[in-house]
Each structure stands twice: as structure tokens, then as C-alpha cells.
UniProtKB/Swiss-Prot annotation:
GO biological process, one term: lactate metabolic process
Name of the featured protein: L-lactate dehydrogenase
Gene: ldh
Residues given in the record as beta-D-fructose 1,6-bisphosphate binding sites: R156, H171
UniProt organism field: Borreliella burgdorferi (strain ATCC 35210 / DSM 4680 / CIP 102532 / B31)
EC number, as in UniProt: 1.1.1.27
Single annotated GO MF: L-lactate dehydrogenase activity
Modified residues (Phosphotyrosine): Y222
């Protein structure tokens, strides 16, 4: 049960501040946003900057600088803290560094008395979501990662650009790791009510073009990092959507880091990985176990095994 429509953000870097900004300009539900960062001056500066724009908002939100004590009565704790991916690094290169940072963060949050929902955005997000669940000992439905929400948004953007239709009419997902081993659910993709297979048959898109689109999705982060140093606007919007889905009890389907334990053929167990799930005020209401093609299932298992190889080396 939601208590106060209060969100605590841990991490005032590019991703965290982008989420905070997105939340303030598109807010109808959150009453209070508290920002925590190891760099207290950075957090205080973000709070000041956001508050100075209150006159321009449709609905004011109380933005405050805080400490871990402020997590006690929060509904949601969003974690964007941790080291960022550098040029040439994969997200999985950050496992050891960020898992150590997370142990301290999660311990402090839980010690405050927090019993709400964790939303994790730090990379590698699927593993960091699992780490959060293990360190917090929270029920799996109360620990959510951003998963492939950004990958899916990128996919729908590229498809909408190709077909010249609104992204809202593109129905497709990226599943698996938020990273290089992800895959697109082409066999289940529809443009409005029309299956992608029909567009292929009509010659309006080719298998080669689909492969190129998926490559663009996978390489998007590397390209943005090369050009501007980091990605943060789009994922900030994605986090905002997850938070609003929880606060607003939207029961919306989002491709998040979902806890998989036997779904999708039974081979994937005890892991968080990108898969569509219903998100509501309780966190994850249900991880959808829809049918995907054997080829896609093989890719899902392969992606999960890659993540599992890192998790199995960790001690909790």
C-alpha cells in the first residue's frame, strides 16, 4: 500500500538528474522527491535548480536534499548511483565495482526502515537488480530494474522511423540482457494490428534491414557515449514511466528487469532479466510468460546464461 507518494532518488549524476527533471515536468502523482548523493553539493545543487522552476510546473512537487533516513517512509527508492560505462567498456565490465557500491547503499536504505519498492537503473542493471534483491532480502515483486525499457524504446523509434508511423503504434519488445546479448521479438512484432511478417512478405522491410535495426539498438549506447560521454535523457524518461506506473497503479506492461524462475521453457531460473511484466502499486504484479519462437527462446536462454555466469561467481 502506498503511503505518501514519496520518492527517494539515490544518485544525482546524469541519469538521476534527468529522471528528477522528467518527473517534475510530467508529475501528477508524486508529492515529494528527495535526492541523495555521495557528493552532497551536487545533490543540493540539483534540488535548488529543480525548485527554481516550480513556477513553470502544472503541479508543484516538493524537492528536497536528504539522507538515508528519508527512505523510511518513502514509497519508492530509485537507484541510479554507481560508476558509469566508459568508452570501450561493456555494461558487464561494471559488475564488481558497482556491486560493492550497492552493498553499502542497500544496507543503509534497509536500515532506515524502508519497506517500499526498489527501482534500479545502475548498470549492469539486470545484475544490479539481482544484487539489490539479495542484499535487501525484499520480495521479488518489490525489486524492479529498468531492464530493456530503453532498448525497447530505441527499437520502436527505429521501426517508427522506417515505417513513418507513431511509436505508440509499434508493438515490439527487446528482451534479455540490457546489453549486447539482447534480442528483438520480431516474430511477435506488430505495426498496429498487422504482423511484421506481412510487411516482410510485401517487401516493405527486409530481414537485412531488421538485422541492421537490432544492431543499431545494441550499439546505440556506445554511439551516444562516444558522441557525448554518457546516456541519460532517454533512460531518465524510462525510469519516470516505471515510477508513475507504480504510484499511479497503472497495471501497465513494461519490459523491465523481471525475476525469472522457470518461465519461458523452464531453463532460466533465479535471475533478473529483461522481459515484459505488469507493473502496479505493489511493484510487479505478473511476469508475462508469452510464447516466443524457438529461435528467440534460444537467444533468451543464451542471454540469461551470460548473466548467470556473473551472478554465480558472486557471494551474498
Amino acid at each position: 500500500m502506498l503511503k505518501s507518494n514519496k520518492v527517494v532518488l539515490i544518485g544525482a549524476g546524469g541519469v538521476g538528474s534527468s529522471f528528477a527533471y522528467a518527473l517534475t515536468i510530467d508529475n501528477s502523482l508524486v508529492h515529494e522527491l528527495v535526492i541523495i548523493d555521495v557528493n552532497e553539493n551536487k545533490a543540493k545543487g540539483e534540488v535548488m535548480d529543480l525548485n527554481h522552476g516550480q513556477m513553470f510546473l502544472k503541479k508543484n512537487i516538493n524537492v528536497l536534499f536528504g539522507t538515508y533516513k528519508d527512505c523510511a517512509n518513502a514509497d519508492i527508492v530509485v537507484i541510479t548511483a554507481g560508476l558509469n560505462q566508459k568508452p570501450g567498456e561493456t555494461r558487464l565490465d561494471l559488475v564488481d565495482k558497482n556491486s560493492k557500491i550497492f552493498k553499502d547503499i542497500i544496507t543503509n536504505v534497509v536500515s532506515s526502515g524502508f519497506d517500499g519498492i526498489f527501482v534500479v537503473a545502475s548498470n549492469p542493471v539486470d545484475i544490479m537488480t539481482y544484487v539489490t534483491m539479495k542484499y535487501s532480502k525484499f520480495p521479488i515483486h518489490k525489486v524492479i530494474g529498468t531492464g530493456t525499457i530503453l532498448d525497447t524504446s530505441r527499437l520502436r523509434y527505429f521501426l517508427s522511423d522506417h515505417f513513418n508511423v507513431n511509436t505508440q503504434n509499434i508493438h515490439s519488445y527487446i528482451m534479455g540482457e540490457h546489453g549486447d546479448s539482447s534480442f528483438a521479438t520480431w516474430d511477435e512484432t506488430k505495426i498496429a494490428m498487422k504482423p511484421l511478417s506481412e510487411y516482410l512478405a510485401e517487401g516493405k522491410i527486409t530481414e537485412l534491414e531488421l538485422d541492421e535495426i537490432h544492431k543499431k539498438v545494441v550499439n546505440a549506447a556506445y554511439e551516444v557515449i562516444k558522441l557525448k560521454g554518457a546516456t541519460y535523457y532517454a533512460i531518465g524518461l524510462g525510469i519516470k514511466n516505471i515510477v508513475n506506473a507504480i504510484i499511479g497503479d497503472q497495471n501497465v506492461i513494461l519490459p523491465i528487469s523481471s525475476y525469472i524462475n522457470g518461465q519461458y521453457g523452464g531453463l532460466i531460473k533465479d535471475i533478473y532479466i529483461g522481459a515484459p511484466a505488469i507493473v502496479c502499486k505493489e511493484g510487479v504484479k505478473e511476469v508475462l510468460n508469452f510464447k516466443i519462437s524457438p529461435k528467440e527462446l534460444d537467444k533468451f536462454n543464451s542471454s540469461a546464461n551470460q548473466l548467470k555466469s556473473y551472478i554465480d561467481k558472486m557471494e551474498f
